Amino acid sequence: MTQPSPIQAWHALMQSRDMTALANLLADEVVFHSPVVHTPQLGKAITLKYLQGAMGVLNNGQFHYLREIIGERDAVLEFATEIDGLQINGVDLIRWNDDGQIVDFKVMVRPLKAINLLHLKMGEMLARLPATAAGAA
């Protein structure tokens, strides 16, 4: 099965960590749903910052996708990684528009210990990132 171009682009930037490519993949009106923040985060700049932080925390050499369920305009990507000896399992739910830009990105994680660890690690990572993430317009 051929992957839609937004998913191909997502996989490529997960490898390259290219924040300009990530900024180009996100629609201006994108909404990000964090597993540790109860309110949706609105807009490209904040979504870019959260995803940049998540890449720094989760994409640590152990991160890999286990399976993908891909529709016409959305995908569910199940992932696994390990941080500080803790096995983490989660899903990225991604929806895109006619232009192939991501308009909705939701991350769900298990187990509860993983959520608590990610909350701590993401807080540390976000504090180190510049106020405006690179490439955000």
Predicted regions and their residues:
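A beta-strand edge to alpha-helix "cap/lid" segment located at domain peripheries
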Residues: 55-137
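Short acidic-aromatic low-complexity motifs
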Residues: 4-25
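A solvent-exposed, acidic/Ser-Thr-rich amphipathic alpha-helical stretch
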Residues: 19-72
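A generic structural signal for ordered secondary structure
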Residues: 2-6, 90-92
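A short glycine-/small-residue-rich loop at the edge of a beta-strand within enzyme catalytic domains
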Residues: 1, 13, 38-42
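Hydrophobic alpha-helical core bundles mediating ligand binding, dimerization, or RNAP-core interactions
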Residues: 7, 26, 51, 77-79
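Short hydrophobic/aromatic segments of transmembrane alpha-helices and their interfaces
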Residues: 4, 30-31, 84-85
